[in-house]
Amino acid sequence: MSLSNKLPVTDVDLKGKRVLIRVDFNVPLDENENVTNPQRIVGALPTIKYAIDNGRKAVVLMSHLGRPDGKVNPKYSLKPVVPVLEELLGKSVTFTEDCIGPQTEETVNKASDGQVILLENLRFHAEEEGSSKDAEGKKVKADKADVDRSASLTALGDVYVNDAFGTAQRAHSSMVGVDLPQKAAGFLVKKELEYFAKALESPARPFLAILGGAKVSDKIPVIDNLLPKVNSLIIIGGMALTFKKTLENVKIGNSLFDEAGSKILGEIVEKAKKHNVEIVLPVDYVTADKFSADATVGSATTQRIPDGYMGSDVGPESVKLYQKTIAEAKTILWNGPPGVFELKPSPRPTEATLDAAVKAAESGSIVIIGGGDTATVAAKYKAEDKISHVSTGGGASLELLEGKELPGVAALSSK
């Protein structure tokens, strides 16, 4: 699956057409059903506004919210999104009580002059995810006839646009089942694909990957996919301690040791040697007796973390090593924070490593943060606008790094 050859919405003639856009409005709501963080709605605005300005018939928005398990549940209605969307767009938004059916089709077909229509939660129907849950919480497959009703979504548009990268790894009806001649990438998806293509298909070199996480075994598919592509690999987070204990016989105190992951480190090292990849590991640590804001903290060299303590972050010498490696790279792909950045005693190493990535971006390097916890770090230290790209899709970006095909991307038309 090529990431760089997907049809962008800017290459599609939208004039006089019903533009059906899969957005990600899975936003948090408070107890009064008010949207508490509109970031995902804001992220979709460029595509929505483009469709309004260039289509002039109807802009039909569809999304999921929460996990209603294939049944109608007012708690997960998208209706609270309407006032937020209206304020952001500066125009009225029509809400439909269902996402499919004759009444919804009539509303869409009567629309004109760039009218914006928001459909009710896609996941109120079992056919969206292909299953629902019964009263006992057991999964029940959707009826074949119901799954085929993805044609009902197709009836709502003339052109399909996907701008929900965070759901691109899921082969759901709204992601892969809409059968229209042109299926384009919205601006948000287009940006995601462009940046991941820069790293995974045609990176400027040296190409550095920074990978973190608690367990090596969780990142084996990512490491395996990236080793033939990168020039250097910084291992951070808890899994670095499994590397240190296994490869260098370092005492790691009470730190988590990934027994299963340790058994394949030999293969990883051999593969790195085969592809001439430098693996960079920490050389000192910040330690803590517990993962809590009132933890007793200390420091440790590369040789030994004392019993009763865990490695909670890297030390100053490790940061210097990371900074040097980051400064030398022209493409940097980062997934996973260096340490337990939530702890008050040890934010600085994480922040210092992020600062190095920001400086690299400012000097012209491509720096991509792969969603999830790493994106949270970027937001915490207000670095989102200083990095080349912070991915909006934790699960989707992880699957791209693993070399997997994303169903929602594969379903898009080629240029």
Swiss-Prot record:
CDP binds at G213, D218, G237, G336, F341. The keyword Ribonucleoprotein does not apply. Pathway: Carbohydrate degradation; glycolysis; pyruvate from D-glyceraldehyde 3-phosphate: step 2/5. Belongs to the phosphoglycerate kinase family. PROSITE patterns: PGLYCERATE_KINASE (PS00111). Keywords: ATP-binding, Cytoplasm, Glycolysis, Kinase, Magnesium, Metal-binding, Mitochondrion, Nucleotide-binding, Transferase. Catalyzes one of the two ATP producing reactions in the glycolytic pathway via the reversible conversion of 1,3-diphosphoglycerate to 3-phosphoglycerate. Both L- and D- forms of purine and pyrimidine nucleotides can be used as substrates, but the activity is much lower on pyrimidines. Negatively regulates the biosynthesis of acetyl-CoA from pyruvate in the mitochondrion. Its EC number is 2.7.2.3. ADP binds at G213, G237, F341. This is Phosphoglycerate kinase. (2R)-3-phosphoglycerate binds at V23, D24, F25, N26, Q39, R40, S63, H64, G66, R67, L122, R123, R170. It is an enzyme of class 2 (transferase). It holds the Pfam family PGK. It is found in: Cytoplasm; Mitochondrion. SUPFAM superfamilies: Phosphoglycerate kinase. Its cofactor is Mg(2+). It comes from the Eukaryota. GO terms for cellular component: cytosol; mitochondrion.
